[in-house]
Amino acid sequence: MKYQLITLFAFLSCTTKAQTAVDLGLSVRWADCNLGAEKPEDYGGLYGWADPTGKCTDANVYDDDWNWLSDSLYGGYRNIKGICGTSLDIVRMKCGKPWRLPTHEEMNELITKCKKEKIQINGVWGLRLTGPSGKTIFLPAGGRREAVDILHQGKTGNYWTGSVGKRYKAHKDFRAWYLFFNASGYIECSDYGLRYFGYSIRPVRK
């Protein structure tokens, strides 16, 4: 059990260019850029899970094996099954309908049905995914934010879904599903993401 004073905020703007939907041949279309980015190789923002504003806030975070408790901006002490398309979904709030966070199932479909390649675009390392349609998207390795520190930028990619973690029963109330990849080629969807970490976000739509 631990008690922390965490400053929760996005380091980059929540505003984003008009998203272009890329049809990879999957169940949803994926945006060509991260939330907060202007180009595919831009990192965009690093956002806390269930923060619909992306703005700065000081929150007393009581974080242990069975709950997640913070101010109401970050979901509070509630049993949330998922936030895709809800008022806690920053994509829906910033980009409008029909854009939203991907679900765990949609993120898993992305990494299992697409060809994956480690590449650099304009000096930015990341993951290129080629779908069954032959079209591609690029996920830059934006690292993650812990409190005020940005870690492993250019080395790892961390991308939120809107799905609450279920695999770890002891942590199910304060973990969420996310995509992780690194320079060694390791790629997985994990439900071990701490919600107060700042991760990248790639919007989706039907």
Predicted segment positions?
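Bacterial Sec-dependent N-terminal signal peptides
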Residues: 1-19
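C-terminal, surface-exposed recognition/capping segments
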Residues: 22-206
